Amino acid sequence: MALTPGWGSSAGPVRPELWLLLWAAAWRLGASACPALCTCTGTTVDCHGTGLQAIPKNIPRNTERLELNGNNITRIHKNDFAGLKQLRVLQLMENQIGAVERGAFDDMKELERLRLNRNQLHMLPELLFQNNQALSRLDLSENAIQAIPRKAFRGATDLKNLQLDKNQISCIEEGAFRALRGLEVLTLNNNNITTIPVSSFNHMPKLRTFRLHSNHLFCDCHLAWLSQWLRQRPTIGLFTQCSGPASLRGLNVAEVQKSEFSCSGQGEAGRVPTCTLSSGSCPAMCTCSNGIVDCRGKGLTAIPANLPETMTEIRLELNGIKSIPPGAFSPYRKLRRIDLSNNQIAEIAPDAFQGLRSLNSLVLYGNKITDLPRGVFGGLYTLQLLLLNANKINCIRPDAFQDLQNLSLLSLYDNKIQSLAKGTFTSLRAIQTLHLAQNPFICDCNLKWLADFLRTNPIETSGARCASPRRLANKRIGQIKSKKFRCSAKEQYFIPGTEDYQLNSECNSDVVCPHKCRCEANVVECSSLKLTKIPERIPQSTAELRLNNNEISILEATGMFKKLTHLKKINLSNNKVSEIEDGAFEGAASVSELHLTANQLESIRSGMFRGLDGLRTLMLRNNRISCIHNDSFTGLRNVRLLSLYDNQITTVSPGAFDTLQSLSTLNLLANPFNCNCQLAWLGGWLRKRKIVTGNPRCQNPDFLRQIPLQDVAFPDFRCEEGQEEGGCLPRPQCPQECACLDTVVRCSNKHLRALPKGIPKNVTELYLDGNQFTLVPGQLSTFKYLQLVDLSNNKISSLSNSSFTNMSQLTTLILSYNALQCIPPLAFQGLRSLRLLSLHGNDISTLQEGIFADVTSLSHLAIGANPLYCDCHLRWLSSWVKTGYKEPGIARCAGPQDMEGKLLLTTPAKKFECQGPPTLAVQAKCDLCLSSPCQNQGTCHNDPLEVYRCACPSGYKGRDCEVSLDSCSSGPCENGGTCHAQEGEDAPFTCSCPTGFEGPTCGVNTDDCVDHACANGGVCVDGVGNYTCQCPLQYEGKACEQLVDLCSPDLNPCQHEAQCVGTPDGPRCECMPGYAGDNCSENQDDCRDHRCQNGAQCMDEVNSYSCLCAEGYSGQLCEIPPHLPAPKSPCEGTECQNGANCVDQGNRPVCQCLPGFGGPECEKLLSVNFVDRDTYLQFTDLQNWPRANITLQVSTAEDNGILLYNGDNDHIAVELYQGHVRVSYDPGSYPSSAIYSAETINDGQFHTVELVAFDQMVNLSIDGGSPMTMDNFGKHYTLNSEAPLYVGGMPVDVNSAAFRLWQILNGTGFHGCIRNLYINNELQDFTKTQMKPGVVPGCEPCRKLYCLHGICQPNATPGPMCHCEAGWVGLHCDQPADGPCHGHKCVHGQCVPLDALSYSCQCQDGYSGALCNQAGALAEPCRGLQCLHGHCQASGTKGAHCVCDPGFSGELCEQESECRGDPVRDFHQVQRGYAICQTTRPLSWVECRGSCPGQGCCQGLRLKRRKFTFECSDGTSFAEEVEKPTKCGCALCA
């Protein structure tokens, strides 16, 4: 209610003081009770259609139903619904909601229904419904959702109805519906779906409604599973059709054969299509703020899907990402910076960055990129920074940078580029800095242009140098004269180790042959060359690769075999292979032979051989394998020969060879098998399998030595006590605290204080950042293959000279954000491969000269955010970073005062001067003894490991001598005890305890209750030096020795003259009538079950009540109503036709039509039931025929029957043939044509048949599905418009002629129901037809018959009947086939089950008796019995008797029961025009029946009003409130 100052109702102005009172009251009520513009009724808050632009505030916490539909809300924030823990129904449809923040629904744990349809949602955040376990119905239809992420519905485990139709979904991530096991309804129709992950719907056993039609399904080999899934469920997923390829377009998916789902090419068949989610929210493993998505160091192996569309920067560095897929970043058009540095990226799709018009920084350094695809940087017009350094790029196309006109810094530093084509940098008009150093440039005539370019544009700042020819080696390119760049046959223009491929400016070079190897006839011979790793570049045509007799120790997972599609044999025998990385053979599906004989393998696991799908021969002879577990050979299903000869195998786990399905030869000889109980299974397995084994023999125990395994009896395989639990388990490849990917181990942010056990020995990257390390773990030196160590964000305060020993392969060391103050001079000794060192964010002030003497490869030093003291002692560092720009210009000086804030990189070295000794704080960082850390006069000594060490005087200890040895100094005695120090004794001190305490430190309270004197059940409570007694209710005194009389006048608790009775448990009050409670203080409410009627008010009295009647009523219970004249009925003057009754509905006359009739006065017959087979309807006066649009609804359970027929020679016929609709049409052409519906309609349900005839074309559609079309291209004739239109059949002579001319295939008349026949959009009235006998009005019988396990047929001879499913019988298909009627003995009658075990016989006319076996019974035993309110029923036991209607009793059903409410649950129906409309779901109410005393009527006393959706027979729908009674009683007749 809105109030305006000074104005009230229409009666006139309100006084100011009265307005203030009203305003204050309205403010108090509105602020706490209901949001503005909303209506609150009970627990329902209705805010629909009020123009809201945001969720209103102050929604009551107890709200159960909230209606916000029909507003202008644009966004749902996280806290909009906070605190609404009781909400069950939330209506948000028909708004403009574009985004819902994650967590918005977290508080609504009771939410059951949520409608978000008809909004503008583009994305669905993951985990949005994670706390809505009670959610059963979710409507997201008619939005713009583009993708369904994997965790979209995680948490909504009780979801039964999910509607996603009419969106723009093009991507469904695998597992998106996995949690929805109870789903019954799923709609995905009218989207842009092209493919669906395999088995997406297999876990939905209750699914009964499923829609997938109107999508863009591409029916290739990846969608073959869907066809089989739909065929197994023929009643759901109807009209799901293929949109491609062209040969399958328009076909139903379920009808396409498996062989027709094909993929072109082997690569496509193996590649399961994936989709990049076009919009999303912050990934769970990342952090997002201010448009920046930070996923650094999260162990990612792929770019996350479903990222925020609005992000401007994404940080993905320090992960394990191996490739950038097509369009990976294209959806994120606002991106300005992408950082993918320090990953494992080897492949980039050409369109990975397509469309990023705002991108200005792209960081890709520290990866494994070898090639830049054509056009990969196309369209990046605003790019200013491009870092490609520290990769393996060997070739740059001339047009690689043609769109980068605004690029200012390009780094190609540290790659494998040997030459650059002229014009590569021509388009870089804004370039200011170019890094080309650390590349093996061949300075021949092809590179002359680069020298000229660099002299003209001195922008190359990293010092790029020549590597070849020898005369120009190590000279800076920009300083060499042009004439020196020449091509000569006398010079060698290659770099040793790189001449295995040909140079080509287009980067399409094919490998010639690996260095030092021989290549002949597709055989690459690289044996006996002392190789330590497999050559990187091998010709793609290679069929056999010989690498035997080398020194290879580790087989790395480089993906090199993906390009060798012709490779058949790999020989790695006689090497030093001790480790094979998981996935090392990925892509080697064509390899059939792998030889690993004579190596150093100690264990094997299935991941080592992943990718060898076609392997047939695996040779593992002469290794060090000790056991075989059941994961050793998983996936090698094609292996026929497996040799494990001459290893150290002692045991084999059960099932170890079960996955080798093709195994025919297994060599286990020369192994020391221990034939104990763990190997008992193998003897039996070898005997049963028909494979060649060579009879392996036992080595242990002694009594079985040299006995073949197959010959050992099962009882002889026995174990000593305690050995049963042994066995062979796979070696753990990753610590429990860490995550491992290939050779990358991530143990970040795990609160570690020590290095976890189980780190693989071949680890190359180890991430220990974000932990609690105080020192560098000493075990790091045992991992000799380490290339990267990240120890940032720990608490490391010092390094030693041995912290990084034995790490010769280390290239990246990150020590940033620790507490380092001083670096020892030999801390980095031996790190000759180190390229990147980060000391950023520590407390370092100085570094000793020569500290980087061994790190000759160092190119990046991060030392910023340190308080550098830039005096003469740091001058060397300034000069060192300037050579090669090793420091990026971040580090600044913190002292002396005149150097404060100056950059280490740009400040001239001469400025670094010593004007006196550094401050004591600076000196103490590398000489902590200067800060006097030792306390209590301890002596400080420098220590190379612990930085310093204190020598403590007598009486003190600790690192800083801070701990006193005086045992009483810490006050060990508690509770006021006195400490006495002891010298030379076992105990360093003793305590003198006060009274009430004891123990070594006086910490124990003495138990004074040991000898207590509490009597009569009193409880002793210990105190300090004493105790007290807690007495029962009826005792008192210090020891509970005195009995208390609780019923004495002073203590009597009973009120209102109640009698007090003493009991052992205390006093008990016996109350007077009318009172209750423990002390009889409560006056009983006698009005609780009062019988006052007609709105009378009950007045409570002592032990009684009285009724205060409303005006005009009288009687003790106000049951006598006033005398009023009977009102005039609205039905007077209303004429209802065809036997309809007029009823009063809200003072409005309404005709209640009989079944089959419709119209305001029931004047039209709209539905008919064909009960005889030889009958029909005949229309003779039709307009605009034969150009007609015919629609009708049909229900039948028959296979054949005529629906429509018109014409003679030139005809149109519609018939039911074998359950399908068949249309035959002949407008004058010959021969006539016919089409059939794909659907069957003989299931007893109503189906809509739509037929459009226009000249020579006919369209047929069933239930609004895709139409079937037929064209006749003969000479056009007009059909005979004078011939009648027959419905449901036709005369015998017409039938015979049509059958003879093949116009119909089955002449059977229609048997079933037809309703709502429209011809040219005009609803037909069957009363205006020639109706033959056998056609009856109405199709309602099946609404009265419920079939539990079957389908209702409305037109059976005895009336509606159920066609039961297999295994069910009975009138309602509710009895099992093997129920009590199975094998019944009814002779002349029908068996009727009474319960699960017994039955009775319902006799035919003329028979009686319990088994209907007595002839001569009266044909009509009920003839003389007149039941007033019921019907007569005869049985063999009771004879003829009355069965009364509900509400009546008596022998003749003559007695009406008292007013009562009979519960009803059914659909509610109304009539609108000619259409019959009913609610979409049943509702519950009570029917008031019975009699009332006097002149009262039995009617509803309590009514419930709710809004329901109605669906009408003409296809329309609407919503309307329905009012139904929920409680009945006697009241004044209305």
Swiss-Prot record:
Glycans are attached at residues 72, 192, 406, 571, 630, 762, 801, 806, 1026, 1079, 1189, 1259, 1306. Residues 1166-1339 form the Laminin G-like domain. LRR repeats lie at residues 62-83, 86-107, 110-131, 134-155, 158-179, 182-203, 310-331, 334-355, 358-379, 382-403, 406-427, 541-562, 566-587, 590-611, 614-635, 638-659, 762-783, 785-806, 809-830, 833-854. Disulfide bonds join 286-295, 443-466, 445-487, 513-519, 517-526, 675-698, 677-719, 929-940, 934-950, 952-961, 968-979, 973-991, 993-1002, 1009-1020, 1014-1029, 1031-1040, 1047-1060, 1054-1069, 1071-1080, 1087-1098, 1092-1107, 1109-1118, 1131-1142, 1136-1151, 1153-1162, 1313-1339, 1342-1352, 1347-1362, 1364-1373, 1381-1391, 1386-1401, 1403-1412, 1422-1432, 1427-1442, 1444-1453, 1459-1498, 1477-1512, 1488-1528, 1492-1530. Residues 1-33 form the signal peptide. Keywords: Developmental protein, Differentiation, Disulfide bond, EGF-like domain, Glycoprotein, Leucine-rich repeat, Neurogenesis, Repeat, Secreted, Signal. SMART domains: CT, EGF, EGF_CA, FOLN, LamG, LRR_SD22, LRR_TYP, LRRCT. It is found in: Secreted. The keyword Secreted applies. GO terms for biological process: axon extension involved in axon guidance; axon guidance; dorsal/ventral axon guidance; forebrain morphogenesis; motor neuron axon guidance; negative chemotaxis; negative regulation of axon extension involved in axon guidance; negative regulation of synapse assembly. It comes from the Eukaryota. Predominantly expressed in adult forebrain. Expressed in fetal brain, lung and kidney. Thought to act as molecular guidance cue in cellular migration, and function appears to be mediated by interaction with roundabout homolog receptors. During neural development involved in axonal navigation at the ventral midline of the neural tube and projection of axons to different regions. SLIT1 and SLIT2 together seem to be essential for midline guidance in the forebrain by acting as repulsive signal preventing inappropriate midline crossing by axons projecting from the olfactory bulb. PANTHER family: SLIT HOMOLOG, SLIT HOMOLOG 1 PROTEIN. This is Slit homolog 1 protein. It comes from Homo sapiens (Human). The gene is SLIT1.
